[in-house]
Amino acid sequence: MRGLVSKTGLLAEKATLATVCSVIVCVVMVAGLSLFVEIDWGRFPLWLAALVVGALAFAALGLAIGALTRDVRAASLLAFMLCLPLAFLALVPSGAVAPALYDVIRAVSAVFPFKPALDALDAALNDAGDLGGPLLHLGGLALAFGALGRLSLQRFAAT
């Protein structure tokens, strides 16, 4: 990579752009959903916070995948191969499978932002549980995936 923008700056700009675009789309979707389902707009700051932190975690995951593969087609394929099964794992309720299998599913789901984002949005939209825990979890995942993306760029720059 050459140019006036640092690698970290480029990753931060891409993450910010992806986060802003994602939040705008999600706010429009929730507004459309409110035509059919009652939404408590008094909780708007809470679900906006959940959307922003969740979108940032997903943006960082996308940046890490892109930095690890360095090819657009491979990154897209890897993103779909990873994300579709992981999204289903986030939706598995506790009584649907054996307890040992559910513990494995919880451990795998904790490494990716799907389940924490679902928990954060559920807490923000429906007042269902604690919002702080999922937001901290998503923030940690955003930092971890951002660092992974940055380290991946450094590794490829050396070769």
PLM region spans:
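Alpha-helical transmembrane segments and their short interhelical loops
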Residues: 7-79, 131-135
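Short hydrophobic, aromatic-rich alpha-helical segments embedded in or entering the lipid bilayer
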Residues: 96-135
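Hydrophobic alpha-helical interface/terminus motif in multipass membrane transporters
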Residues: 32, 36, 65, 69, ...
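Hydrophobic/aromatic residues in alpha-helical transmembrane segments
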Residues: 28, 60-61, 85, 117, ...
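Transmembrane helix segments
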Residues: 69-111
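Hydrophobic alpha-helical transmembrane segments
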Residues: 1, 19-30, 76-94, 155
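Junction motif at the cytosolic side of a transmembrane helix
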Residues: 64, 125-126, 137-159
